[in-house]
């Protein structure tokens, strides 16, 4: 599919985002794109930019992109999920566990931040209207 090939080339070759996986989701035309790690602010910027980029490239190829969890009553539903990773920016190592078993303070802080900002994350990433 020329649309996906162009997106993959732009993200990896032009932008250097380290796209490492494109997975077909449950319904026709649904895909999950998985990127290399970066800090949270840069990933948020990439997320917003990616939505605009996908819509523009799709339009160029005669397609329409939506991020709605479900586009109509009879269609397969979207997973409408966001994957999170907690890792050191300096080393890239996971810092979720402090001793291999118990959560670290950083892991608790990450979860607290997600819970505190859950409404905003949902509004931006899992919108019910087409944006």
Model-derived features: where do they sit?
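Glycine-rich, acidic/polar active-site loops that bind/position phosphate-bearing ligands
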Residues: 1-128
């Amino acid at each position: 599919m020329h649309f996906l090939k162009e997106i993959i080339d732009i993200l990896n070759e032009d932008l250097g985002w380290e796209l490492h996986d494109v997975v077909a989701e449950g319904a026709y035309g649904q895909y999950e794109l998985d990127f290399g790690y970066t800090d949270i602010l840069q990933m948020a910027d990439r997320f917003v930019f990616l939505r605009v980029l996908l819509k523009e490239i799709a339009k160029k190829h005669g397609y329409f992109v939506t991020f709605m969890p479900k586009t109509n009553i009879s269609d397969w539903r979207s997973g409408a999920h966001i994957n999170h990773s907690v890792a050191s920016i300096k080393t890239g190592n996971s810092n979720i566990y402090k001793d291999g078993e118990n959560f670290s303070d950083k892991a608790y802080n990450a979860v607290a931040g997600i819970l505190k900002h859950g409404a905003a994350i949902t509004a931006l990433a899992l919108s019910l209207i087409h944006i």
